[in-house]
Amino acid sequence: MRNHGDFLFTSESVSEGHPDKVADRISDTVLDAYLQADPEARVACETLVTTNRVILAGEVRGPKEVEDTLIDRAREAIKDIGYDQEGFSWKKADITSYLHAQSADIAQGVDSGSDKDEGAGDQGIMFGYATRETEHLMPAPLYYAQTILERIRDYRKNGDARGVGLLPDAKSQVTLRYVDGKPVGVTSVVISTQHVEGMSQNTIRETLRDVVNGILPEGWTCPEDEFYVNPTGNFVIGGPDGDAGLTGRKIIVDTYGGAAPHGGGAFSGKDPTKVDRSAAYAARYLAKNVVAAGLADRCTIQLSYAIGVSKPLSVYVDLDGTGKDVDEARLGAILNEVVDLSPRGIRKHLRLNRPIYVPTSAYGHFGRAPDPVLDNFTWEQTDLVTTLRGALNR
């Protein structure tokens, strides 16, 4: 995203009932089941969902007894999302598991022994980003797109009269106007939400207009002719009955809405030895702490890894010209020094070997507030602020 000058920028989001997000939810349900039984379990679970059909595939290493519970757990996940429709129902869906043992060739490069550090589970590049555009240090278009769908979910699941008739599948898209690189207003909003047969589109529009007005900053009003609700008309057939869904297909929604680079790796269904997930969380953690410390208004972090190698091959910092008298190369070295960026170091620092991943499967992995019971989203903490300021002043 160009962060200077005047421009329009758009981000989209999808709800927990979107087919790809249903797949993500089930994959993370499998992951949490294994981590609950064994914090050192290995999981790489892919899910396919379509009309009353769910297929699990991938590799695992963990307690055998967990396997026998997975179909019931997947069914409960579908129930919690809200699907009990003719074409996709938690009661009737045919759920099949093809999960099998993790490759020994991968395990020998990843497992730690007495004479070596634990290596990364694969090669790859991961990015983290933070910006002062919102209080959560997230890009504003994505933040508002996510929040709109979370509000609709709350109406639907919490018994609010405004949610009556709304169904789980939904999408949003928000376009903001930037002046001198800063968001100053909204130019368009698109929302498509599944609903019961016969529900008035005018009623849906009025409800969603109230949602949007309650979320956007004061003075930001979307023009009526640029406020699009179910633009194609009825949206009754949705979810996996309307479109097949796959794990890992919404990686931009999961991260920064296109405002920052993406290394290409998905998150859901992967245990934290997979640096696609854990290193992306670490990169966000570092970038957020840099911005929270007042060292820059924007920060992009890139980390890179090789399979079987414990330390990152590179740590790259880009402050996009917003640094406060900070040398980016020196800052990168400091970040690599104050946090152990090996796979095990990341997991230990952020306490990732726990069943904390189901809540990440929808509405974004970043910019989220932790659940006090789960103690999750640890990568959103800003506990490095004092350390970074002190290190730069040495």
Swiss-Prot record:
Cofactor(s) of this protein: Mg(2+); K(+)
Gene Ontology biological process terms in this record: one-carbon metabolic process; S-adenosylmethionine biosynthetic process
Free-text comment on the cofactor: Binds 2 divalent ions per subunit. Binds 1 potassium ion per subunit.
InterPro entries attached to this UniProt entry: ADOMET_SYNTHASE_CS, S-AdoMet_synt_C, S-AdoMet_synt_central, S-AdoMet_synt_N, S-AdoMet_synthetase, S-AdoMet_synthetase_sfam
Involved pathway(s): Amino-acid biosynthesis; S-adenosyl-L-methionine biosynthesis; S-adenosyl-L-methionine from L-methionine: step 1/1
Protein family per UniProt: Belongs to the AdoMet synthase family.
Family annotation (NCBIfam families): metK
Protein name listed in UniProt: S-adenosylmethionine synthase
Organism encoding this protein: Gluconobacter oxydans (strain 621H)
